[in-house]
Amino acid sequence: MVQKYQSPVRVYKHPFELIMAAYERRFPTCPLIPMFVDSDTVSEFKSEDGALHVIERRCKLDIDAPRLLKKIAGVDYVYFVQKNSLNSRDRTLHIEAHNETFSNRVIIHEHCCYTVHPENEDWTCFEQSASLDIKSFFGFESTVEKIAMKHYTSNIKKGKEIIEYYLRQLEEEGITFVPRWTPPPVGPSETCSSSKNQVTSAAVLVPDAAAVMEGLSGENLSSPGTASEPVVGTPDDKLDADYIKRYLGDLTPLQESCLIRLRQWLQETHKGKIPKDEHILRFLRARDFNIDKAREIMCQSLTWRKQHQVDYILDTWTPPQVLLDYYAGGWHHHDKDGRPLYVLRLGQMDTKGLVRALGEEALLRYVLSINEEGLRRCEENTKVFGRPISSWTCLVDLEGLNMRHLWRPGVKALLRIIEVVEANYPETLGRLLILRAPRVFPVLWTLVSPFIDDNTRRKFLIYAGNDYQGPGGLLDYIDKEIIPDFLSGECMCDVPEGGLVPKSLYRTAEELENEDLKLWTETIYQSASVFKGAPHEILIQIVDASSVITWDFDVCKGDIVFNIYHSKRSPQPPKKDSLGAHSITSPGGNNVQLIDKVWQLGRDYSMVESPLICKEGESVQGSHVTRWPGFYILQWKFHTMPACAATNLPRVDDVLASLQVSSHKCKVMYYTEVIGSEDFRGSMTSLESSHSGFSQLSAATTSSSQSQSSSMISR
C-alpha cells in the first residue's frame, strides 16, 4: 500500500532570500542531519540573467537499519537524486527528490516548495509532500516501510530547526539581509513592456493570494457554530502549522498529514463547504488516525446530520417545558483544564416519568441539543483560554439512584442515546466523573458498558460514597470555587432538581408514537436503495417550460450514475401490490423503477443530461432548466466499473469501493424541488451554464441541444 505524507503550511517570518541563504548551507553535508553523509553536484544550470538556477545533486544517506537487513540488501548507503529549481524572479524554490538505490523495488518521491507568504512578502512559506511505495524487498517489506517512515517523520520537523539554526549562524556573521534579485539593465522599450507584464501578472495573482489566506488565517474555521456547520472552502485552502497548534493542538507529523489529506478529500467531494477542522480531527482520533475508517464513519455522520437537520437543532427546536422542569442537568462553568462542565443529577431524575411523558425521541433530541451546545462552548473556551479545547467534562451525581432507574424502556432509551452519541460525537467527552455511586450502580454499568467505546470508557472516574472528597477526588479536576452546592461546595448550581414527573403529564403509547414520528419525519430528505439492475427513479411532471428542477442528494453507500430523462408520455406507476419489476422495499429505503423495459431510448424517452458518475461520500447539488413540458425522470443507477479497467492496475480506493458494494447495493438520500419560471426571480443565465461543476471526480456535465443546466457539489 502506498504511504503518503502531506505537511501543513509552515511559515518562516523571514524574507525568501534570507531563507535561501540559510538553506544553501545544508550542502554538501549537514552535521545536524547525521544520516546525511555527503552530496555531489551532478548538473547545474544558471540563466543569463541569474533569475533561474537549477541544480541536481546525488545525496548519500546512512540509514539506521538492522545490520542483517543491510547485509541481505548488499548496501551500506542509500543514494537519492535531488533536483532544486530556484526562480529568483518569482521567489520560489521547488525541490524534487527520488531514490536511486533499489528504485525497481522501492519508489520514493518527495516534493518541497518554498514560496513567498501571500499576505506578507517578507515571510516565507514551506510545504512538503511525499509518497512511499514498496513493491518488494526480499520479504522484508513491512520492516523497510517501518524504518522508512520512522526516519522520515523524525526528520520532518527537524527541517525548520535546521533553517533556524543557519539563520542564527548568518546573524552571528552579520548577515541579516539578502537583496532581492533584480533584472539586468534593459532598453527603454523593453522596460515598458516588462513593467506592463509585471502589472498584469500581479493583478492576476492577487485574488489567488487572498483565497489562499482565507485558508491560512483559519478565521472561518474557528467561528462559533455547530460541529458540522458548513465552512466555505476551496482546493486552495491550506492549513497553517501555527493555526493547527493554536486551535487543534500538538499533532505528530503523520497526524497532521492525515488531517490534511482527509480535509482535501472532503474539499473534492463536498466542494465549497466542509466540516470544521475540529470535527474532522475528532473522527480521526476516534479511529486512531486511520483515514479510511475515519472517512467512513464521518460520511455516515454527516449524512445523519443532514437527514435530521441536526445542524439547526439549537435554532429551530425548543425543548418541551417538561424537560426544562424535570431534566436534572445543565452547564456549570468549566474544569481546571478549561473544558466546559456539564452536571447531570441522574439519581434525582425520574427517567420513567420522562419517557412516559415525552417519549424516547424527544429525550434523544434534547441530548443532541446538549451535545451541540457543548461543541459551541468548546469553541468559545478555545478562544478564552488561548489553547485548543475540543471536549467537555461531565459530572454525574448518582445519589438517589435505585431500581426505578432500571425500568426496561428507560434503559432501552439510554442505550439508544449512547449509541447515537458514540457514532456522531466521537472524542467529545474529555472526562466523566461519576460521584456517589450506590450499590445498584454495578447493575446499570453491566447493562450500558458494552455499548461504550473502549477509548471513552478509559475516561471514566467512579467514586462511591464520599470518596470524591478525598485525595484524587473532585478537587483534582474542578476548582473549589465552582464545586456545586449539592456536593458540599460553595457555588450555586443552576440545574433543575428533577423530581417525579406528575402522572397527569403521562401520554398514551399512541400519542407518543405519533409524536416520535413527527419529530423524525420533519426531514425533507428521502432515502432510496439502488441495486445492480434495479435503479431508483422518481417522476416530475412539468406543465410550463423554463421551469427549474433542483436536486440535492448524498451518496451514502457505493458509487452511482445520475441521469435525467424526458418523456412526452407518463410511465406506468408501480403497482403497490406488486414488487416484481417495478418496486423493491428494503430497510435502507425504497426502490422504484418507472421506465418500462419495452421503452427505447430516443423513441419513447430522451436523455437531457450527460450521465454523471458520483462516488461514495459525495454530496451533490444541481439544477436543470426545462425546455419543454412533459414528464422528467430522475434516475440513480448502480455504477459498474468498465470492463477495460481490468487490464490496468486498480487503485486502492477502487478496490475498497468494490469490496464495500460487493452486495451490489447502493444507498442515496435525496431531495428535489420544482421552481416555476414565474416564481424564480434570480438570473436565469446563472442556471444556463454550458459547463457543470457537478463533480471534480467525474467529467463535467455539459448542456446538450435539449437542455441547459448548472450543477455543483456542495455540503
Swiss-Prot record:
Q: Which intervals of the chain form a coiled coil?
A: none
Q: Name one Pfam family in it.
A: PRELI
- What are the PRELI/MSF1 domain coordinates in residue numbering? 3-175
Q: Which UniProt keywords apply?
A: Cytoplasm, Golgi apparatus, Immunity, Innate immunity, Phosphoprotein, Signal transduction inhibitor
Chain ranges of the CRAL-TRIO domain: 319-495
Stored Gene3D superfamilies: CRAL-TRIO lipid binding domain (3.40.525.10), GOLD domain (2.60.120.680)
Quote the CDD domains the UniProt record gives.
Answer: SEC14
Subcellular location(s): the record lists:
Cytoplasm; Golgi apparatus
Give all residue intervals belonging to the GOLD domain.
521-674
Required for interaction and inhibitory function toward RIGI as annotated region, ranges: 1-510
The molecular function terms in GO held by this entry are:
protein sequestering activity; RIG-I binding
Q: Does the keyword Cytoplasm apply?
A: yes
* InterPro entries found in the cross-reference section: CRAL-TRIO_dom, CRAL-TRIO_dom_sf, CRAL/TRIO_N_dom, CRAL/TRIO_N_dom_sf, GOLD_dom, GOLD_dom_sf, PRELI/MSF1_dom, SEC14/CRAL-TRIO_domain
Q: Which GO terms describe its biological process?
A: choline transport; innate immune response; negative regulation of RIG-I signaling pathway
Which proteins does it associate with, and in what oligomeric form?
Interacts with RIGI (via tandem CARD domain); the interaction is direct. Interacts (via GOLD domain) with SLC18A3; the interaction is direct. Interacts with SLC5A7 (via GOLD domain); the interaction is direct.
The name this protein carries in UniProt is SEC14-like protein 1
Gene name linked to the record: Sec14l1
